[in-house]
């Protein structure tokens, strides 16, 4: 197993990459997120876990200001998303399997297009850096519509890093990849966190992946945080053999595991 990112939140007094406080969001009479609070420190990979419908996507969409919360606050660094939306989102980026890239554009055209949207300074230089970092030089003039899933994931991650985000949101980033490509992607992201000290909020249903890559995890159910802690020690603390068994227990009997206050 490869080493995780080194995370020492106590070493710095800087604001966390992300701070969510008392977040609530409902759709009509359905309460999707109910008073959720957590932080992602700079240089930390935090896993956001839970069954379908637990509230993960709603949380991500409120952080990205796609949705407006009913109450609560979201801060990216020292910026309040509700008051300083553009500045806060300029420090943020996002990658997911379902966030497809324009297939009629080449790799370089896609990166150029999004780089202009993000107002990236010295864009050509930045694109060349990312092409090298993600081993995309040979594909630079290939249209994204003919790339493999692994190649598309590398382009999507390069796109997400164009603006050197302080906060990176990754929703199932390896879901469409074969094991070798998924392993390489995890290694790349860990190296990026180590080198750039950005914070990462990572969702996944792959518990092996979560144990390998995440510094901490939050378990969600019915829009609430049930458990939070180190993915390697949580199973033992709650009588499960591994993280997958704990996930299944929480998904089936969430009320048996009261929420714990985050440190």
Give short role names for the model-derived ranges:
Residues 112, 116-139:
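Conserved ABC ATPase "signature" region
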């Amino acid at each position: 197993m490869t080493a995780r990112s080194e995370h020492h939140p106590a070493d710095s007094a800087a604001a966390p990459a992300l701070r969510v406080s008392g977040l609530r969001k409902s759709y009509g009479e359905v309460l999707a997120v109910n008073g959720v609070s957590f932080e992602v420190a700079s240089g930390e990979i935090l896993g956001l876990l839970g069954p379908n419908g637990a509230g993960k996507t709603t949380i991500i969409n409120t952080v990205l200001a796609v949705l407006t919360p009913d109450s609560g606050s979201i801060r990216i660094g020292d910026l309040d998303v509700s008051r300083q939306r553009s500045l806060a989102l300029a420090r943020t980026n996002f990658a997911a399997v379902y966030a497809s890239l324009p297939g009629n554009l080449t790799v370089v055209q896609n990166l150029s297009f999004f780089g202009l949207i993000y107002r990236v300074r010295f864009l050509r230089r930045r694109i060349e850096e990312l092409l090298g970092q993600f081993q995309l030089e040979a594909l630079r003039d290939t249209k994204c519509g003919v790339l493999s899933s692994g190649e598309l994931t590398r382009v999507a991650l390069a796109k997400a890093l164009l603006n050197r985000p302080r906060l990176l949101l990754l929703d199932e980033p390896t879901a469409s990849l074969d094991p070798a490509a998924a392993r390489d992607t995890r290694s790349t992201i860990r190296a990026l966190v180590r080198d750039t000290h950005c914070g990462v909020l990572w969702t996944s249903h792959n518990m092996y992946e979560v144990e390998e890559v995440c510094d901490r995890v939050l378990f969600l159910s019915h829009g609430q945080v049930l458990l939070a802690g180190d993915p390697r020690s949580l199973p033992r603390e709650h009588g499960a053999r591994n993280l997958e068994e704990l996930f299944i227990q929480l998904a089936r009997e969430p009320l048996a595991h009261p929420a714990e206050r985050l440190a």
